[in-house]
């Protein structure tokens, strides 16, 4: 009961933080994908080679009074849908670096995006729509994992290599058009006796300038949370949440947008299942988020379906 009370208290603090007034990234799109980390975020891989995969879908909209820069124009009443399949081949040698197990991965993704908006043209607003199918940017990541009994820690550095489908004159893009560096860490409390687990991952993103638009997004902060309870050895249920807050203003945006700091928060349910495929243990996780307290970016909901396949024996 004490564990559950503490965990619920953390989620209450998260909601309070998310609702605190704070003043966006270019076009309302950030390098960091909020919610990409959930439960068990700081648990080290048990296999030297593995293939985590995430199927992702997001649908959101911005109010007609909320301006975003898309396609080199101010856009209002933006509606957007985005679907992608993330492939994350991961190498984690059974060695120690600073007392931690290392992990190195590269994320690549095919995806689809569609966007419609009322663009502020020279004479009068015009309804425009756009869609794109292609590949996103590449995200290399290096991690270190520590473990002591029920406590687990993780440190990471990742970044964006802007090689994905991108055109500054389009409403829809799969790449973000600029480089970025993100540094952070995570913690997981996992009690195998009681079945309770709590994870938190936090970090900061520094965005490089987009050379096509001379626009530089500000420094971003983000927090991903996961709380779960195992009902059997294979099945668990729980809650997830995220908060995303831009700390410093953009540069290069139209003067009418002001400092254009973005933010969003979300909560939702999750469930997970572990099953055997031959000698391999396959991890499957489904989680969904509903966004609130959003500013200077679309607001909606997203779904993650995660599956982790070990490619070598533990």
Give the residues covered by each predicted segment:
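Short loop/turn motifs that connect adjacent beta-strands in outer-membrane beta-barrel proteins
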Residues: 25-27, 40-48, 60, 93-103, ...
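Surface-exposed strand-loop-strand hairpins of Gram-negative outer-membrane beta-barrel proteins
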Residues: 25-30, 59-84, 119-131
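Transmembrane beta-barrel strands of outer-membrane/channel proteins
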Residues: 33, 51-59, 104-112, 155-161, ...
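Extracellular loop and loop/strand-boundary signature of outer-membrane beta-barrel proteins
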Residues: 38, 71-77, 123-129, 167-173, ...
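Residues on the lipid-exposed face of transmembrane beta-strands in outer-membrane beta-barrel proteins
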Residues: 42, 53, 87-93, 140-146, ...
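Residues that define the transmembrane beta-barrel architecture of outer-membrane proteins
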Residues: 47, 79-87, 129-138, 175-181, ...
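Outer membrane beta-barrel transmembrane domains
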Residues: 70-72, 211-314
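Detector for outer-membrane/organellar transmembrane beta-barrel domains
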Residues: 152-159, 165-255, 266
């Amino acid at each position: 009961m004490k564990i559950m009370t503490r965990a619920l208290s953390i989620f209450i603090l998260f909601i309070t933080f998310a609702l605190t007034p704070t003043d966006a990234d270019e076009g309302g799109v950030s390098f960091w994908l909020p919610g990409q980390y959930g439960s068990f975020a700081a648990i080290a891989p048990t296999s030297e080679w593995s293939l985590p995969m995430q199927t992702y879908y997001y649908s959101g909209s911005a109010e007609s009074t909320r301006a975003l820069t898309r396609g080199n124009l101010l856009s209002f009443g933006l509606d957007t849908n985005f679907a992608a399949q993330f492939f994350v081949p991961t190498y984690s040698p059974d060695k120690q670096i600073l007392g931690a197990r290392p992990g190195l991965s590269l994320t690549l993704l095919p995806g689809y995006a569609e966007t419609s908006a009322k663009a502020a043209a020279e004479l009068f607003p015009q309804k425009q729509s756009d869609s794109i199918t292609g590949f996103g940017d590449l995200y290399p990541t290096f991690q270190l994992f520590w473990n002591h009994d029920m406590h687990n820690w993780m440190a990471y550095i990742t970044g964006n290599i802007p090689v994905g489908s991108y055109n500054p004159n389009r409403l829809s893009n799969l790449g973000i058009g600029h480089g970025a560096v993100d540094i952070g860490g995570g913690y997981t409390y996992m009690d195998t006796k009681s079945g309770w687990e709590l994870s938190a991952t936090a970090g900061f993103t520094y965005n490089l300038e987009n050379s096509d638009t001379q626009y530089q997004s500000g420094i971003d902060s983000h927090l991903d949370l996961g709380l779960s309870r195992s009902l059997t050895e294979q099945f668990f249920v729980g809650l997830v949440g995220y908060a995303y807050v831009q700390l410093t203003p953009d540069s290069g945006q139209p003067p009418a947008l002001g400092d254009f700091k973005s933010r969003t928060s979300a909560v939702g349910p999750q469930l997970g299942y572990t099953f055997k495929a031959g000698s391999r243990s396959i991890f499957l996780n489904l989680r969904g988020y509903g966004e609130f307290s959003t500013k200077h970016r679309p607001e909606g909901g997203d779904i993650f379906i995660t599956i982790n396949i070990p490619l070598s024996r533990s």
